[in-house]
From Swiss-Prot:
Coiled coil region boundaries: none
Biased composition (Basic and acidic residues): 17-50
Molecular functions per Gene Ontology: protein tag activity
Disulfide bonds: none
Family assignment from sequence similarity: Belongs to the ubiquitin-like protein UBact family.
Organism superkingdom: Bacteria
Function according to Swiss-Prot or TrEMBL: May function as a protein modifier covalently attached to lysine residues of substrate proteins. This may serve to target the modified proteins for degradation by proteasomes.
Cross-link Isoglutamyl lysine isopeptide (Glu-Lys) (interchain with K-? in acceptor proteins), where in sequence: E63
Name recorded for this polypeptide: Prokaryotic ubiquitin-like protein UBact
Amino acid sequence: MSGRSTFGRFGPPSSEPWERKPGDDEGGPKRPKVERPDTNDLLKRMRRVDPNQSRRYRQRTGE
């Protein structure tokens, strides 16, 4: 034997590859907590830029 461990240079695998924070019950990426834009405000801004585009958007989304 060459004196190396069976795990190589990385060491033994840990049971959990990351540290859990207290209160972190769910795994995976989190969705940022931001408020949704007001659709009326969005349509007003679209109307200023291109009136036809705001009309098409309203038809497509059912507004």
